Amino acid sequence: MKITFLGTSSGAPTRYRNLSATAVQPERGKPWVLVDCGEATQHQLLRTPLSPLRLEAILITHIHGDHCYGLPGLLASCQLNGRTAPLTLVGPQAVWEYLQAVMQFTEMRIDYPLQFLPVNEKLDVSAGGFQISAAPLSHRTECWGYRLRETQVPLQLNVERLQAEGIAPGPGYAHLQRGEDLQLADGRWLSSADYTQLSRRPRVAVIAGDNDRPELLAGLCEGADLLVHEATYTEDILLQVGPEPQHSSAERVARFAEQQRIPNLILTHFSPRYLSKPRRQGDRLVAEIRAEARRHYSGQLQLAEDLASWLISRDGMLLPL
C-alpha cells in the first residue's frame, strides 16, 4: 500500500508545497485513488509515474478551494487524453454542484462515465483496490475523513479441511484459492469462503480532511495502520489564531494518535507561515511542528513533503520510497 503526497500546503501554495492532494495505490496493479484535488494537482502528477487514466476514484473531503480547485482541470485533461474508463467522484453535494457549474460555463465536456456519490456515514464503495468508508469531521463547512482498506489480499487455502473431506489436490484447489466456487464431479458445490481465509490482515489508511476535533476519527481509525491528518499550526499559533478556522495543531493530532495507539502518523496541510529554512529572524519552521508532535506521540512520525512516497509494508511498517 503506497501513499504519495501531491500537495501539502494549506490555504495557498508555496514555492515548495502545492495544495492538498494525496494518491493511494494498492500493492499490485496500476489503478489508484486520489484524496482531494487542490489547484495544479494535475501538474504534480506529471512529476510522478501515476497515470490519470488509471485513476478509479477521487475522494473530496470538503468544498474549500485548496482541496478541490484542481478537480475540473484534472477531469478535463482525462477527457482530452481519451479516457473511456468510468471514474467515481465522492464528496459533499456542494462539490458536485461546483463541478456542474464549471462544466456549464466553461463548456467543459466529459464523455467517459463519471459517477458522483454523495458522501455519508453509510459510504461503502470499492475502487482502486480499496474498500472505502467515511466519517464526518468538524470544520467550517461539511468535511469528511476517509478510511481505505485494501481488498486485494491473497487467500490462504485450508488444505487440511479439504483433505479431511476427501477432496484430493488438483486444479480445483487453485479455483478455490482465487475465490471461485467449485463444482465437484459428483455434483457437489464447494464455496470458496468455506475453505479459505485471508493470508494476512488487510492494511488500512485513514486520510482526513480539515478538522479541529481529531477524536471524531476514533471509529474510522480502529485497527488503522496509518493516519494522515492536517497539522496546520503548532499549538501556540492555533491559540493565537483562535477557533474560527477550525484546524488542528500538531499537539492535538499527536495526542489523539497516541491515545488510539495508531502505529504510524503523517502530518500534512501546513500553514505557509512554516518554512523549511529560516529567511529572517523570527521565522517559524516546519521543524517546530515535528518537535511538538514528537512530544506527544511515540509511534512512527513523519511530516509530509510534496512528491514524497511512503509504503505501508505488510507488517504495518511505514517505509520511505
Could you say what each language-model-derived stretch is?
Residues 121, 213-321:
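Binuclear metal-ion centers of metallo-dependent hydrolases, dominated by the metallo-beta-lactamase
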Residues 39-90, 118-120:
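Active-site metal-binding motif and surrounding structural segment of the metallo-beta-lactamase
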